[in-house]
């Protein structure tokens, strides 16, 4: 999914909706199925869950990499590739000097944003040592990645809890 102005477009099927000043959705090129954003979002979540269950979910994108290592500023450290699948996130970059992976169990929620500080769409992963702010260089749905991270966490947590029992 991506948005521009008042229009939201599904990247997968091309369905377009507009959002009015009252928060109501109206379909542009199909019959209206959703009139409220939470309904659309719940439907998106179900689609991502199905993609994960079918083993079809994966994301891979070239990214510009910034790091937050102190409270002073965000440092641009180079370029790389961010991937996400059932095994979690993998970030490689900076001419082979950076490799960071984050398992689904470590991603209860994901910091993602649209047009973050007018730089671009952003996905942030990391740990207590550093946060990696990844700005995709190609069009991907950061909202879908966030939903997938949350759903993969739920699966990993259920598996972990089952092992304890």
Task: List each model region and its residues.
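Broad, structure-driven detector of short, well-ordered beta-strand segments within folded domains
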Residues: 2, 17, 79-87, 133-134
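Cys/His-rich short segments
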Residues: 2-32
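Hydrophobic residues embedded in beta-strands of well-ordered beta-sheets
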Residues: 8, 89-90, 123
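Acidic, low-complexity intrinsically disordered regions
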Residues: 13, 36-39, 112
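Short, surface-exposed beta-strand/loop "edge" segments at domain boundaries and coil↔beta transitions
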Residues: 16-18, 67, 73-75, 91, ...
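Anionic N-terminal interaction surfaces
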Residues: 25-83
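Phosphoinositide-binding peripheral membrane targeting modules
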Residues: 72-81, 85-119
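Acidic, Ser/Thr- and proline-rich intrinsically disordered linker/docking segments
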Residues: 104-165
């Amino acid at each position: 999914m991506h948005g521009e102005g008042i229009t939201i477009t599904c990247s997968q099927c091309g369905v377009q909706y507009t959002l009015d000043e009252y928060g109501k959705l109206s379909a542009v090129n199909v019959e209206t199925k959703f009139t409220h954003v939470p309904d659309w979002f719940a439907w998106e979540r179900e689609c991502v869950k199905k993609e994960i269950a079918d083993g079809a979910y994966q994301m891979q994108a070239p990214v510009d990499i910034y790091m937050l290592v102190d409270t002073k500023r965000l440092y641009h450290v180079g370029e790389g590739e961010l991937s996400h699948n059932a095994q979690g996130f993998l970030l490689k970059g900076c001419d082979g000097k950076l490799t960071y992976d984050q398992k689904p169990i470590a991603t209860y929620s994901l910091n993602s944003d649209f047009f973050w500080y007018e730089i671009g769409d952003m996905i942030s992963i990391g740990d207590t040592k550093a946060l990696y702010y990844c700005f995709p260089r190609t069009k991907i749905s950061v909202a879908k990645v966030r939903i997938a991270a949350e759903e993969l966490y739920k699966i990993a947590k259920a598996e972990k809890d089952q092992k304890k029992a």
